[in-house]
Regions:
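M16 family metallopeptidases and their MPP-like homologs
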Residues: 1-40, 46-99, 107, 112-120
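His/Glu-rich zincin catalytic helix
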Residues: 28, 116-142
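A common structural junction motif
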Residues: 33-43, 132-141
Length: 142
């Protein structure tokens, strides 16, 4: 599962996956492969983009059903200095990016070889295979 954190300035891209301990390094390698393929041989298609836009747009009404959710939406308007009618504009904004724009942003911002990994698990079982991947410096925090 992948999500982008809300923030002013740099945003964290979080990729999370529950995996079996003995499959940790293989799962990490697969995540890097999937994103590398996405950036090269298997980029997002027009159909995938259309489905993603439709999914986001169709979920909008349910995102503001509670007072707390609406408060969060209004808070985002203030925090990110958006127009007061931002929530009304949101469906059109979600539909706006073209396939070319999405692919260009992916190339610009998704950098699998620059990621920081946070792995939680049994160190005695996962450390050696993770180091063998060669994804960068490994720091152990206990």
């Amino acid at each position: 599962r992948t999500r982008l954190g809300d923030a002013k300035g740099q945003r964290a891209m979080l990729v999370t996956a529950p995996v079996q301990t003995d499959k940790t390094s293989e799962s990490m390698a697969e995540i890097v492969k999937e994103y590398s393929d996405y950036l090269s041989t298997k980029p997002i298609t027009q159909d995938e983009l259309a489905k993603g836009k439709a999914s986001k747009t169709l979920r909008l009404p349910g995102q503001f059903e509670t007072l707390g959710a609406l408060k969060g939406g209004v808070s985002g308007i203030v925090t990110y200095d958006r127009d007061l009618d931002y929530l009304d504009q949101l469906p059109a904004l979600l539909d706006e990016p073209s396939l070319t724009q999405v692919q260009a942003k992916a190339q610009k911002y998704i950098k699998p070889n620059q990621w920081t990994w946070l792995i939680v698990g049994d160190l005695s079982k996962i450390e050696e295979p993770i180091r063998a991947l060669g994804l960068g410096e490994v720091k152990v925090i206990k």
